[in-house]
Design a protein with these regions (language model features):
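Gly/Ala-rich beta-loop-alpha elbow adjacent to hydrolase catalytic centers
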Residues: 98-103, 107
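A short loop-to-beta-strand scaffold at the N-terminal edge of the catalytic core in hydrolase folds
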Residues: 1-4
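Serine-hydrolase catalytic machinery in alpha/beta-hydrolase-like enzymes
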Residues: 9-75, 79-87
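A conserved amphipathic alpha-helix that caps or lines the catalytic cleft of carbohydrate-
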Residues: 28-29, 111, 175
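The conserved beta1-alpha1 loop
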Residues: 14-17, 124, 152
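The feature captures the conserved acid-bearing segment of alpha/beta-hydrolase catalytic domains
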Residues: 127-197, 203-209
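Short beta-strand immediately N-terminal to the catalytic nucleophile in serine-hydrolase-like folds
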Residues: 94-99, 123
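Conserved hydrolase catalytic core segment
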Residues: 109-119
């Protein structure tokens, strides 16, 4: 938990693939983010716990996606959030969820499952995930967020991987879906591929949802 002591500051929940979120939090401070608390969640089985349903791996012999996001979301809502917020001096002004790559997919998927999160930042989200855009189009959102941030690296479509190469089209489709539902949304295109300045990209998303 990385906290700035301010009256009723927002709390943002961030699943991380490694580390404890310190690098992202430091980038947020460099961007002059308003006071907020960042709760980083590590120790995840990334492909299993952040994927909404089962799916083959992105390349032959790669680890498949386990489709256990619902279980992780239950743990987040039932255990992680209550424990994190019990240490705060006051209840949060609002809650957000953020994520990079597959965690960015999870953050958006959560809007169709719960109304706990009022703002979402998905940086280089894995929106190529098979079936997700259709899932989002065909179902009613449980939450109507106050702001949604999307981003992608400009070179992320330059991949031989057939599953991933349409990620820009999928991200634009998600942007359009939110705009059609009158949800304030932005899509930021960053230089580089999927692995360029990941902490800064995530921090830019958090900054945007904190200031919009």
């Amino acid at each position: 938990v990385h906290a700035q002591h301010a009256e009723s500051a927002p709390v943002i929940y961030l699943p991380v693939v490694m580390g404890d979120g310190t690098e992202v939090y430091e980038r947020c401070q460099e961007l002059d983010c308003p006071p907020f608390t960042l709760v980083a969640i590590g120790g995840l089985d990334w492909n299993r716990e952040l994927s909404p349903w089962e799916c083959d791996g992105t390349i032959r012999d790669a680890e498949p996606f386990g489709g256990q996001a619902a279980g992780f979301l239950d743990e987040l809502l039932g255990q992680i959030i209550p424990k994190a917020e019990s240490s705060l001096p006051q209840p949060p002004a609002w809650r957000g969820v953020a994520g990079y790559s597959l965690a960015g997919l999870f953050a958006l998927w959560a809007l169709w499952q719960t109304d706990v999160f009022e703002r979402v930042a998905s940086a280089s989200g894995s929106l190529w995930f098979p079936g997700f855009i259709d899932y989002a189009r065909e179902r009613t959102m449980t939450a109507t967020p106050d702001a949604v941030y999307l981003s992608l690296g400009k070179k992320e479509t330059k991949t031989p991987n057939r599953m991933m190469r349409h990620v820009l089209d999928d991200t634009r489709a998600m942007e359009e879906l939110f705009i059609e539902r009158d949800i304030p949304t932005t899509l930021e295109l960053n230089p580089g591929n999927h692995f360029t300045q990941t902490d800064l990209r995530m921090a830019r998303g958090i900054h945007w949802i904190l200031t919009h």
